[in-house]
């Protein structure tokens, strides 16, 4: 029993000595794909679009290979939809989300250059939406352009989101207290952006890949 207690104390001392906090900022670009069931809309075309992601991050390292990381970021989830038959119909949508991913961070490698893998879940809130493009007016028989804010409709739009998140990257220790990171991260939404208020079910999901750089201060 005495040996077990001593072993536990030794383990806790090692863990505590290796534990450290870090905070930082991140920024980069993301490519979003909007997945939907087109049903009867056979000429409806949906394409992904690039956006921007910016955020702050905090991480607590339990050991030199395991940490708990939480980010707060602003991420755009943009997409474009058009019609194959009616080439004048072209909508470019820009969607801003506030996201909170919480992840386990696994690290491996040498002292200065290390690889890492982040796995976890995220919650998000749809802040606003904007659309720009052109459409066809059947009454006037002409094309018109628009550039406007999209108003949310509570019965239709699901503004809360959550899903799975994972990422891989490299970290370079610049000095004892500063480190730079490069990461490719993937967000997989599990909640449809539309509420099922109509007879025909209409499920729509975001899948977002972010390429981001970051700088961390290590305490």
Which residues does each PLM region occupy?
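Short sequence motifs at beta-strands and strand-loop junctions characteristic
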Residues: 46-51, 92-97, 154-163, 205-207
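Predominantly the C-terminal beta-signal and adjacent terminal strand-loop region
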Residues: 156, 161, 166, 172-219
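Short glycine/proline- and aromatic-enriched beta-strand/turn motifs that initiate or cap beta-hairpins
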Residues: 19-58, 157, 218-219
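Gram-negative (and chloroplast) outer-membrane scaffold detector with strong preference
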Residues: 21, 29-35, 59-141, 174-176, ...
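Short helix-to-loop capping/linker segments positioned immediately adjacent to catalytic or ligand/cofactor-binding
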Residues: 104-110, 153-157, 169
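Solvent-exposed, glycine/polar-rich loop segments of beta-barrel outer-membrane systems
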Residues: 134-152, 196-203
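Extracellular loop and loop/strand-boundary signature of outer-membrane beta-barrel proteins
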Residues: 39-45, 85-92, 151-156, 197-203
């Amino acid at each position: 029993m005495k040996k077990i207690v001593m072993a536990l104390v030794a383990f806790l001392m090692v863990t505590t000595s290796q534990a450290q906090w870090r905070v930082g900022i991140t920024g980069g670009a993301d490519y979003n794909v909007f997945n939907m069931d087109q049903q009867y809309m056979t000429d409806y075309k949906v394409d992904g679009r690039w956006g921007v992601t910016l955020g702050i991050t905090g991480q607590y390292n339990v050991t030199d290979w395991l940490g708990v990381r939480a980010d707060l970021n602003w991420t755009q989830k943009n997409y474009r939809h058009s019609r194959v038959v009616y080439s004048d119909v072209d909508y470019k949508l820009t969607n801003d989300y506030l996201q909170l991913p919480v992840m386990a961070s696994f690290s491996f490698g040498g002292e200065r250059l290390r690889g890492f893998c982040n796995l976890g879940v995220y919650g998000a809130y749809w802040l606003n939406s904007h659309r720009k493009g052109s459409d066809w007016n059947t009454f006037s028989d002409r094309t018109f352009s628009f550039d406007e804010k999209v108003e949310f409709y509570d019965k239709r739009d699901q503004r809360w989101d959550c899903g799975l998140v994972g990422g891989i990257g490299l970290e370079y220790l610049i000095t004892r207290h500063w480190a730079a990171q490069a990461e490719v991260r993937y967000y997989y939404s599990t909640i449809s952006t539309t509420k099922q208020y109509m007879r025909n079910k209409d499920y729509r999901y975001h899948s977002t890949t972010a390429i981001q750089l970051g700088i961390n201060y290590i305490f």
